[in-house]
Amino acid sequence: MVFIVTVLVGIAVHIATGNFFTSYNISTLSRAASFAIIVGFGQTIVLLTGGIDLSVATVGQVCGMASAIFMVNYGMNPYLAIIIASLMGIALGAVNGFFIAYFKMTPFIVTLATMQIYKGIVYVITKGMPITGMPENAQNLA
């Protein structure tokens, strides 16, 4: 149903503006929506199994911060930094899974707590400041 409504809105906007379905616009929309789509697939699995994960965006923040630090402070190859940051994301998700599975804790409580912990980690490490000076080849990946 959501897909049908999305297509209908796209058609209506194209009729109104005449330039919605251009290759540039489709490419831009695809890049902008890719993170939400990937997270949506993962969250669908979590919700279908009766759980909820509130820490997804915060895990993304930790991983993004880590990859930026690896590239800016240590001059690491962007692809390697992204792979290491992705492995960190898997490890942080495994922490949630460990507490939920082995201690039989409620997923809502565990992920709410780890979300706050991960936010604190990002804040302490970055001191609330953005990480600047990303290499040019890393900016093209975004």
Tell what function each PLM region has.
Residues 2, 20, 60, 111, ...:
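Electropositive phosphate-/nucleotide-binding environments in soluble metabolic enzymes
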Residues 45-48, 77-82, 102-106, 126-136:
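A cytosolic-side transmembrane-helix exit/cap motif
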Residues 107-142:
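Transmembrane helix-bundle core of multi-pass membrane transporters
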Residues 3-12, 41-42, 62, 83-95, ...:
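Generic alpha-helical transmembrane segments of integral inner-membrane proteins
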Residues 1-5, 27, 31, 80-84:
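Alpha-helical transmembrane segments of integral membrane proteins
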Residues 7-74, 98-105:
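Single transmembrane alpha-helix segments in multi-pass membrane proteins
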Residues 75-115:
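Alpha-helical transmembrane segments within multi-pass membrane transporters and channels
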